[in-house]
Swiss-Prot record:
Protein's organism: Weissella oryzae (strain DSM 25784 / JCM 18191 / LMG 30913 / SG25)
InterPro entries assigned: ConA-like_dom_sf, Kunitz_inhibitor_STI-like_sf
Cofactor: Zn(2+)
Record EC number: 3.4.24.69
Name listed for the protein in its UniProt record: Putative botulinum-like toxin Wo
Ligand binding (Zn(2+)): 250, 254, 296
The organism's place on the tree of life at top rank: Bacteria
Function: When overexpressed the N-terminus (residues 1-476) cleaves rat synaptobrevin-2/VAMP2 between '89-Trp-|-Trp-90' in vitro. This releases the cytoplasmic domain of VAMP2 from the synaptic vesicle membrane, which would prevent the assembly of the trans-SNARE complex on the membrane and thus prevent vesicle-target membrane fusion and neurotransmitter release.
Length: 1336
């Protein structure tokens, strides 16, 4: 019988009512009644054993479905121990009622069949899933030893079965047994509404608690195909969903473990083994009768999840995160020891027993142990246990569909051949939310979870490399065979077996790889000849469904050529022998070049040839060839980057991907790796530059990166095969052009050999310098290097540079065995000259690149003109050696970073905030005394004395004096003083810039209204207004009014009205520029009459005759370029806070937090652009980030920030709005004020007669009363007036709150006629919009 051969049954299929063994076979019976033994609970929680009849549907051999719900107290899960008769149960998987029960059972049945049909299809596509169900259906190996005291050492190996029952015709009781059927998995509806709660709801781990049907034991899975698990994460996290097919697969894996006796804390004799409690001690779970975390770890691979998401061990095992969490973080040693002890204790149960080869392989795959046939026991290696603790226990994926680990925190998981996990991103979640029942999170029946959702597709990686000293797997997926290292030297491998999932100790091209795990079954092809060094070439090819074992004994080394990986990554195989060698870069034909060129976002390295050394060399097809290859790839990548074909981020990511291999090469710790990987700055550079020889290892990973990138960018596998095939075919054709004679001739050419190996070192040195570029020019942290950092970088570069000649000498000595003197002479006279020529050319190229980069940095405003000319001159004069190249890179990098920080932090010498109500000007951030500030313009002191303000007839001015301290060279002193303060003579070249944010309403008249002016002293005590900004004739006017009255002009385009704009005025001696935001508006020139500031300059902002708003006044002691203006505008604009409608908040203005229903409001005051809102009791104000709207939170609800005087508030009722009272048609009145989650703090309510003659205090409330969740506040009369019932019916008048009359609808209800709930339902809010009409 085939795996998962589906029987023709449906929900309506009739139950077996009669059976004649002479004419019928139970093999043809698939729907029948059986009896189940199960645990149940009394009302007081006492347990007992019950037998219940159950209708079973066999959908495939050994796999049964029941549509009747069994309540077992959730099978040991902590839950309500509620007795439910499964015959009358209306709670199948959801709370269904009455007549819908049968239809819902039918849906459940069809849903289960649909899941298994899905599995059936996957069995045709994947041998992993097929073998899994082969284990489930046909390989029933019970792993429990017999009970203590028995003489037999056999392992139970029997089929589990269920009884087939008929109904007694007299008593109508189903008790007549006619036979048994094999049963391995029985799927039943969940015992509660949630099929997965704090643990797997699958029943089977209590000695007397698992169900039995007939003889043997099977596994019961409680499962609902219409349910997807939802994680209870934080409110800011995504809601991850697991596909039901994965959930069922997970539970069936438990069943497989149960059959094999794996990770079961209770043995067949009912005793709890010591290892179960040992594991509990390690994990903090001492309940041996509960499913242990180790069992969950074995069910699927890593049970990792973020530490801040608290979910059960079960969900951890089905959710795959990006960190490992398989050990005790506080005491890793305890974890290793604990796991070693409990695994050893568990496996000792089988000591001395005869076990089958299948069961042996099962145990070895689960625990990484070996079985000794002579002693009949499992050998546990602590080293393997340590690896399992670090990486999480895993099952052989060929048997149990092991989930692959992922690298990022992106809330999706991968599984072989597309089975099982669909975790949806936010945009998909938003589209699906309408299909979920809000209360129970159930998928609607309309959603077909097999077809409606798109799963994440991933190809199986060809092999995994676990780097020595690392605590994570480094996968190299999707690599073609010809780009894998063709030769793998296997050390210390004598006498071991190669089988699937064999772990080999290897050394590949100078990079220490501690383990290689092949992900496919391979067969050994011994047809390839052996070499003179007793090295056997094995061609490993995956054969689907084929298992093999072969011994490799007494071999000094084994050469493994990977020719095929996994389908469809085959057909491209490159084989080299000693008669064929490639000595230069293969030439690509024009068509192929064009293909690469036109491929969008794909970069293919045009590598130099991989050179093969002479036969028997230690480095086979490895170090030298790959090193040259890697160097060329890096060079190509940078060339492509300069052409904008590859982004700098891509290159940086690729470089960072190499770090794990360098950590392994240098035997660095995992902590060092994590630090370097995270920072990607100085540590990254130091790892790259550790030693010159280290560059030999670049080839493997750089090649893998390039191929991975090409694969990832190819839209289809066919496109990838086509693209790659053309390249490989051309490559192989070029190889065929080389003969053995050509190879020998090349081999004998000492100069060529020396030169090629010298180029290797040159390439490495170039790569080192380019790494310096990457680190310093594209530094993600945007921080300048410290002096110590610069010393380290420079010292390391010089160290490598100084070792360069010695490195060349070493290559020369290693390349020749005779006549070292002659070799040295050849090296010094010929090779070294070529090296210097190469370096000279590189300096020339680098200088050009540096100058081009400098020009670009200056044009985009990253560096100032001073720095640009400085480093341009230095580059032209000093750019003569790589050392000085490095010096300039460091200097330029620091300049760029410092310039940005200067603009951001230091350019604003005065930050003025205004409050026109008090007619004051404040200097923010400056106290008395001197503060030193260093920037690109030199060293300055900023001095602020006591602040002085002068007010003159309705306006004020703030005098800013600029003076030069003649006692200090290159220093300028800025002083704030009164008009009568001391005057200083200034240098003739003094310039200035002033900027401010302005909001001007639409002018209501044509009269002149001055906003801003600047005055200079022309003569003795005579001020001349040199610049005026004013509103005139409904337009903004910029003028030099008194100096040149006829030079007034209208700014075009006009300054925007009724919204915030930034005005920047730049005084450049003979001309004045005015900018709006970052655009030039106007220019005033007067070279003959415009004078520099001679003694004193006065800036004036006017607050009369114009209703404008002013903010963030800034003064600069020099001119600001347009690039700087654009930069500061963008930065300043991002710092301001905006209200709900996008208007910028103003200083010292009152605002309301308005609820989403536009009713409840809290008054607050916005103080500064740093968003300090005045405290309101019970209100939590949150600023969500730059350019975000501001919201307040109260009682879990969100409120919008709304200005008090906003025109948008016209339709809302606020404190101070007017209301009119309606007629009251009842007596015995009480006042009900009902608010939804609002804060209410009136001191009193007053009721005024229509005539306005009396003003009586009716109700008095305590101050700051907090009303939550539609609370009701009932007023009572005071001692003077008495209760409100004293008033006559039909009374109307005005309602006042805090002295403000309310003019709108107010409802006063007779509380005696309504309950509190009715009042809440009927009258949601006492203050309503004026156009509301719901008052009865």
């Amino acid at each position: 019988m085939d795996v998962l051969e589906m029987f023709d049954v449906n929900y309506e299929s009739p139950i077996l009512e009669s059976f004649d063994s002479t004419t019928q076979s139970l093999n043809d019976v698939h729907v029948f009644m059986s009896r189940i033994q199960m645990s149940a609970y009394d009302a007081d929680g006492e347990g007992r054993i019950e037998y219940r009849n159950l209708k079973l549907y066999e959908i495939s051999s050994g796999i049964f479905i029941s549509t009747d719900r069994l309540d077992t107290g959730a099978s040991g899960v902590e839950d309500d121990h509620e007795m439910v008769d499964y015959y009358s149960s209306a709670r199948l998987t959801r709370e269904f009622l009455g007549e819908s029960l049968d239809s819902q059972k039918s849906d459940y049945f069809e849903g289960i069949k649909k899941v298994f049909s899905f599995y059936k299809n996957k069995c045709n596509e994947s041998r992993y899933i097929k073998e899994f169900f082969e284990e489930i259906q046909f390989r029933n190996i019970c792993g429990f030893p017999k009970q203590a005291g028995t003489s037999s050492t056999d392992i139970f190996d029997q089929f589990n079965s269920v009884d087939v029952l008929l109904q007694d015709p007299v008593t109508s009781v189903w008790n007549k047994k006619v036979g048994s059927k094999k049963a391995n998995i029985v799927i039943i509806p969940p015992a509660t509404n949630l099929p997965i709660t704090e643990a797997c709801a699958t029943a089977g781990f209590q000695p007397e608690g698992f169900p039995k049907l007939g003889s043997g034991s099977f596994f019961t899975v409680q499962f609902d195909p219409f349910f997807s698990t939802r994680f209870k994460a934080h409110e800011t996290d995504d809601v991850a969903l697991l596909d039901p097919t994965l959930t069922l697969l997970h539970e069936m894996t438990h069943g497989l473990h149960f059959q094999k006796g794996i990770a079961n804390p209770v043995n067949r004799s009912g005793e709890t083994p010591a290892w179960a409690t040992t594991w509990g001690r390690v994990t903090g779970d001492n309940d041996a009768f509960k499913e242990t975390p180790m069992e969950e770890l074995l069910t699927f691979n890593k049970h990792t999840i973020d530490d801040d998401i608290e979910i059960s061990d079960h969900l951890k095992s089905t959710y795959i995160g990006f960190l490992y969490n398989g050990r005790n973080e506080d005491d890793p040693t305890e974890s290793v020891d604990g796991v070693y002890q409990n695994v050893s204790s568990f496996l000792n149960q089988y000591r001395g027993f005869e076990i089958s080869s299948d069961f042996q392989h099962f145990i070895e795959s689960c625990y990484g142990v070996k079985y000794n046939q002579e002693s009949k026991k499992f050998i546990v290696n602590p080293r393997n246990i340590k690896r399992y603790v670090q990486d999480g226990f895993f099952i052989d994926e060929a048997k149990f569909a092991r989930i692959l680990n992922i690298k990022t925190r992106s809330y999706y998981t991968l599984m072989p051949d597309n089975l099982g996990v669909w975790s949806y991103r936010v945009d998909i979640l938003n589209r699906l939310r309408e299909t979920f029942d809000e209360d129970r999170g159930l998928l609607s029946q309309e959603l077909d979870f097999h077809t409606a959702l798109t799963p994440v597709v991933s190809e199986n990686p060809a092999l995994e490399l676990e780097v020595a000293g690392m605590q994570r797997m480094v996968s190299l997926p999707k690599i073609k065979a010809s780009y894998l290292p063709s030769d793998i030297k296997i050390k210390n491998f004598t006498g071991q077996k190669i089988s699937h999932d064999t772990i080999l100790d290897t050394n590949i091209s100078g990079i220490i790889i501690s383990k290689i795990k092949y992900k496919s079954d391979f067969v050994v092809d011994e047809s390839m000849p052996r070499s003179s060094l007793n090295t056997t070439n094995y061609n490993l090819s995956p054969i689907k469904g084929t298992k093999f074992e072969t011994d490799i004994r007494d071999k000094t080394s084994v050469k493994v050529t990977v020719s095929e990986i996994t389908a469809p990554m085959i057909n491209h195989v490159m084989k080299l022998d000693n008669s064929k060698v490639l000595t230069e870069r293969p030439s690509l034909n024009e068509d192929l070049e064009e293909t690469f060129k036109n491929t969008k976002d794909v970069y293919i390295p045009k590598t130099t040839a991989m050179m093969k050394l002479k036969e028997g060399a230690d480095q086979t097809l490895g170090a030298v060839g790959f090193a040259v290859w890697s160097g060329q790839i890096l060079e190509d990548l940078y060339n492509l980057a300069q052409k904008k074909e590859v982004s700098i981020d891509q290159i940086k990511d690729d470089l960072m991907s190499i770090l794990p291999f360098y950590c392994a090469y240098k035997n660095l710790s995992a902590e060092k790796y994590e630090q370097a990987f995270a920072n990607a700055t100085l540590d990254a550079f130091l790892i790259f530059a550790t030693d010159g020889g280290g560059f030999a290892g670049l080839g493997i990973t750089v090649g893998a990166i390039a191929i991975n990138s090409m694969y990832a960018k190819a839209e289809t596998m066919e496109a990838y095969d086509s693209m790659f095939g053309k390249y490989v075919d051309q490559y192989q054709n070029d190889i065929k052009n080389f003969t053995l004679n050509a190879y020998v001739q090349w081999e004998n050419n000492i100069l060529s050999r020396l030169w090629n190996e010298s180029r290797l070192a040159i390439t490495g040195f170039r790569n080192m310098l380019k790494t310096v570029k990457t680190v310093m020019e594209f530094d993600a942290t945007n921080q300048a290097y410290s002096e110590e950092d610069r010393k380290i970088i420079k010292a390391k570069c010089e160290e490598i540079f100084s070792e360069f000649p010695m490195l060349m000498q070493t290559f020369a000595k290693n390349s020749m065995t005779a006549n070292l003197e002659n070799a040295s002479k050849i090296f010094n006279d010929i090779v070294w000259q070529k090296i210097k020529e190469e370096l000279d050319q590189y300096v020339i190229d680098s200088k050009k690149y540096f100058l081009d980069s400098l020009e670009e940095a200056y044009n985009n405003g990253s560096i100032s003109a001073e720095s640009y000319y400085k480093y341009q001159t230095e580059a032209r004069e000093k750019f003569v050696s790589p050392r000085e190249v490095i010096d300039l890179y460091i200097a330029a990098h620091d300049t760029v970073v410092k310039r940005k920080r200067y603009i951001r932090r230091y350019s604003r010498k005065y930050d003025l905030a205004t409050d026109f109500k008090g007619n004051t000007v404040h200097l923010n951030g400056l106290g008395e005394g001197t503060q030193d500030i260093q920037d690109l313009y030199g060293n300055y002191s900023v001095y602020a004395d006591k602040k002085t303000v002068s007010t003159q007839e309705g306006h004020f001015d703030q005098t800013i004096k600029i003076a030069k301290d003649t006692n200090t060279i290159n220093k300028v002193v800025l002083a704030v003083s009164s008009n009568n303060g001391k005057e200083y003579a200034l240098n003739k070249d003094e310039q200035y810039t002033i900027s401010f944010w302005l909001r001007m309403p639409v002018p209501s008249s044509s009269e002149e209204r001055r906003i801003f002016s600047y005055s200079a002293v022309s003569g003795v005590n005579k001020e001349v207004e040199e610049l005026i900004l004013q509103v005139k004739n409904n337009e903004f006017v910029l003028a030099t009014a008194n100096l040149l009255r006829n030079s007034e002009f209208v700014i075009e385009p006009r300054i925007a009205l009724n919204r915030w704009v930034k005005i920047t005025i730049v005084n450049e001696n003979t001309r004045i520029k005015v900018y709006q935001n970052d655009n030039l508006l106007g220019l005033i020139k007067d070279s003959s009459r415009k004078k520099p500031i001679a003694q004193r300059g006065t800036f004036k902002f006017y607050n009369y005759n114009v209703d404008y708003q002013l903010d963030d006044i800034s003064y600069y002691n020099g001119t600001i370029s347009q690039r700087d203006i654009k930069y500061t505008f963008k930065e300043d604009h991002g710092q301001f806070v905006y209200d709900h409608w996008g208007e910028r908040l103003q200083y010292n203005k009152a605002y309301y937090l308005l609820s989403d229903d536009n009713k409840s409001a809290f008054e607050t005051v916005y103080e500064t652009k740093r968003l300090k809102l005045k405290s309101v009791p019970g209100v939590d104000i949150k600023y969500l980030g730059m350019n975000d709207r501001v919201y307040g939170y109260y009682g879990g609800l969100q409120f919008k920030l709304v200005p008090l005087d906003s025109k948008n508030m016209n339709n809302y009722v606020r404190w101070g709005d007017k209301f009119t009272m309606q007629s009251i048609e009842t007596t015995n009145l009480s006042l009900a004020i009902i608010q939804d989650n609002a804060y209410f703090a009136p001191t009193q309510l007053k009721l005024i007669s229509n005539e306005g003659k009396s003003e009586e205090e009716i109700f008095t409330f305590d101050r700051n009363i907090k009303l939550q969740n539609a609370a009701i506040l009932v007023g009572t009369g005071n001692s003077k007036q008495g209760p409100i019932s004293a008033y006559k019916r039909g009374y109307s008048g005005d309602l006042w709150i805090n002295g403000a009359r309310l003019d709108g609808y107010v409802t006063v209800v007779n509380k005696s006629n309504y309950s509190n709930d009715e009042i809440q339902e009927k009258f949601k809010w006492i203050f309503v919009p004026k156009d509301a009409n719901w008052v009865e």
